[in-house]
Amino acid sequence: MLSEKDTIVACSSPPGRGAISVIRLSGDKAFSIIQKITKNKLKKQISVVKFPLNADLIEKCVLTIFKAPNSYTGEDIVEISTHGNPYIVEEVIKKCLDSGAKIAKPGEFTLRAFLNNKLSVSYTHLRAHETPINL
Protein backbone atom coordinates (compact mmCIF):
# COMPACT_ATOMS: atom_id res chain seq x y z
CA MET A 1 0.00 0.00 0.00
CA LEU A 2 1.34 3.41 -0.96
CA SER A 3 1.29 6.07 1.73
CA GLU A 4 1.42 9.73 0.77
CA LYS A 5 2.74 10.49 4.26
CA ASP A 6 6.00 8.60 3.78
CA THR A 7 9.08 10.39 2.52
CA ILE A 8 10.32 8.31 -0.40
CA VAL A 9 13.72 7.91 -2.04
CA ALA A 10 15.00 6.34 -5.27
CA CYS A 11 17.62 6.83 -7.93
CA SER A 12 16.03 8.62 -10.87
CA SER A 13 18.97 8.00 -13.22
CA PRO A 14 19.39 4.80 -15.25
CA PRO A 15 21.82 2.54 -13.35
CA GLY A 16 25.35 2.43 -14.69
CA ARG A 17 24.61 4.82 -17.57
CA GLY A 18 26.35 8.03 -16.55
CA ALA A 19 29.10 9.63 -14.53
CA ILE A 20 26.50 11.39 -12.35
CA SER A 21 23.39 9.91 -10.76
CA VAL A 22 20.46 11.83 -9.33
CA ILE A 23 18.77 10.44 -6.25
CA ARG A 24 15.36 11.94 -5.49
CA LEU A 25 13.95 12.30 -1.97
CA SER A 26 10.31 13.48 -1.78
CA GLY A 27 7.95 14.13 1.13
CA ASP A 28 7.41 16.13 4.29
CA LYS A 29 10.64 14.91 5.89
CA ALA A 30 12.92 15.30 2.84
CA PHE A 31 14.68 18.40 4.15
CA SER A 32 15.05 17.14 7.73
CA ILE A 33 16.44 13.79 6.53
CA ILE A 34 19.15 15.54 4.48
CA GLN A 35 19.94 17.95 7.30
CA LYS A 36 20.28 15.01 9.70
CA ILE A 37 22.70 13.20 7.38
CA THR A 38 24.82 16.14 6.21
CA LYS A 39 24.55 18.35 9.32
CA ASN A 40 23.94 21.28 6.92
CA LYS A 41 21.08 23.76 6.92
CA LEU A 42 19.40 23.96 3.52
CA LYS A 43 19.71 27.71 3.03
CA LYS A 44 20.20 27.78 -0.75
CA GLN A 45 18.32 26.09 -3.57
CA ILE A 46 21.60 24.54 -4.77
CA SER A 47 24.51 23.66 -2.51
CA VAL A 48 27.55 21.41 -2.37
CA VAL A 49 27.75 19.25 0.76
CA LYS A 50 29.81 16.45 2.23
CA PHE A 51 27.64 13.34 2.43
CA PRO A 52 29.05 10.76 4.89
CA LEU A 53 28.59 7.28 3.43
CA ASN A 54 30.29 5.44 6.29
CA ALA A 55 33.03 6.03 8.88
CA ASP A 56 35.75 6.13 6.20
CA LEU A 57 34.06 7.50 3.08
CA ILE A 58 32.60 10.95 2.43
CA GLU A 59 31.03 11.80 -0.93
CA LYS A 60 30.80 15.38 -2.16
CA CYS A 61 27.28 15.88 -3.53
CA VAL A 62 25.26 18.67 -5.08
CA LEU A 63 21.88 19.16 -3.44
CA THR A 64 19.03 20.85 -5.27
CA ILE A 65 15.96 21.63 -3.20
CA PHE A 66 12.43 22.23 -4.42
CA LYS A 67 9.89 23.49 -1.90
CA ALA A 68 6.29 22.33 -2.11
CA PRO A 69 4.23 22.96 -4.14
CA ASN A 70 6.88 23.98 -6.71
CA SER A 71 8.27 20.52 -7.45
CA TYR A 72 7.57 17.54 -9.68
CA THR A 73 5.53 15.75 -6.98
CA GLY A 74 4.10 18.88 -5.39
CA GLU A 75 5.97 17.92 -2.20
CA ASP A 76 9.28 19.04 -0.74
CA ILE A 77 12.03 17.42 -2.83
CA VAL A 78 15.78 17.13 -2.47
CA GLU A 79 17.68 15.92 -5.53
CA ILE A 80 21.10 14.54 -4.62
CA SER A 81 23.55 14.61 -7.53
CA THR A 82 26.41 12.24 -6.84
CA HIS A 83 28.98 10.17 -8.69
CA GLY A 84 27.27 7.43 -10.69
CA ASN A 85 29.24 4.59 -9.12
CA PRO A 86 26.61 1.98 -8.10
CA TYR A 87 28.22 1.53 -4.66
CA ILE A 88 27.97 5.27 -3.92
CA VAL A 89 24.37 5.46 -5.16
CA GLU A 90 23.42 2.47 -3.00
CA GLU A 91 25.12 3.94 0.08
CA VAL A 92 23.42 7.34 -0.35
CA ILE A 93 20.03 5.61 -0.61
CA LYS A 94 20.84 3.45 2.46
CA LYS A 95 21.67 6.58 4.48
CA CYS A 96 18.33 8.10 3.50
CA LEU A 97 16.50 4.89 4.44
CA ASP A 98 18.34 4.72 7.77
CA SER A 99 17.26 8.31 8.45
CA GLY A 100 13.54 7.71 7.90
CA ALA A 101 12.82 7.54 4.18
CA LYS A 102 11.10 4.61 2.47
CA ILE A 103 12.18 3.17 -0.87
CA ALA A 104 9.94 4.47 -3.67
CA LYS A 105 7.94 1.93 -5.61
CA PRO A 106 8.00 2.11 -9.43
CA GLY A 107 5.85 5.03 -10.55
CA GLU A 108 5.38 6.42 -7.04
CA PHE A 109 6.89 9.85 -7.79
CA THR A 110 4.58 10.18 -10.81
CA LEU A 111 1.59 8.96 -8.77
CA ARG A 112 2.26 11.64 -6.16
CA ALA A 113 2.57 14.25 -8.89
CA PHE A 114 -0.80 13.15 -10.28
CA LEU A 115 -2.47 13.10 -6.84
CA ASN A 116 -1.14 16.61 -6.18
CA ASN A 117 -2.56 17.86 -9.52
CA LYS A 118 0.86 18.29 -11.11
CA LEU A 119 0.16 15.93 -14.03
CA SER A 120 -2.82 15.14 -16.23
CA VAL A 121 -4.27 11.67 -16.71
CA SER A 122 -3.10 11.62 -20.34
CA TYR A 123 0.49 12.42 -19.30
CA THR A 124 0.52 9.61 -16.73
CA HIS A 125 -0.72 7.19 -19.42
CA LEU A 126 2.15 8.25 -21.69
CA ARG A 127 4.66 7.76 -18.84
CA ALA A 128 3.30 4.26 -18.19
CA HIS A 129 4.01 3.25 -21.80
CA GLU A 130 7.54 4.61 -22.09
CA THR A 131 10.27 2.17 -23.00
CA PRO A 132 14.01 2.64 -23.53
CA ILE A 133 13.34 2.41 -27.28
CA ASN A 134 10.87 5.31 -27.47
CA LEU A 135 12.59 7.60 -24.96
Residue ranges and their predicted role:
Residues 1-127:
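A glycine-rich (often HGG/GG-containing) alpha/beta subdomain
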Residues 125, 132-135:
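Single conserved hydrophobic/aromatic residue that forms the stacking wall/gate
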